[in-house]
């Protein structure tokens, strides 16, 4: 058995991750405005479309998301367009949605709240 004190930060986050139940996901999504479930089974994810005035604002947001995602070692799928970015989060390791997905979603939302 591995002691938690012997795990590295990266090992610990993988060790602590688990797929959330549908009830847990719905409950936590209620706290995140604009996020919705998409897909099912191993392809289940949470998804949100962020809208912007122009391409520059969209790319600025994408760069900030990349910075946060890299720091969290958790990388969303992004679909980038002129005036919007679709962010899709799931945890491949657990074949579902984990607390890491929901934490990243809240951090991405905070980017826009900070700029208002």
UniProtKB/Swiss-Prot annotation:
Biological processes per GO annotation: tetrahydrobiopterin biosynthetic process
A Pfam cross-reference name: Pterin_4a
Catalytic activities: (4aS,6R)-4a-hydroxy-L-erythro-5,6,7,8-tetrahydrobiopterin = (6R)-L-erythro-6,7-dihydrobiopterin + H2O
Top-level enzyme category: lyase
Extent of the signal sequence: none
Alphabetized NCBIfam families for the sequence: PRK00823.1-2
Protein name (record): Putative pterin-4-alpha-carbinolamine dehydratase
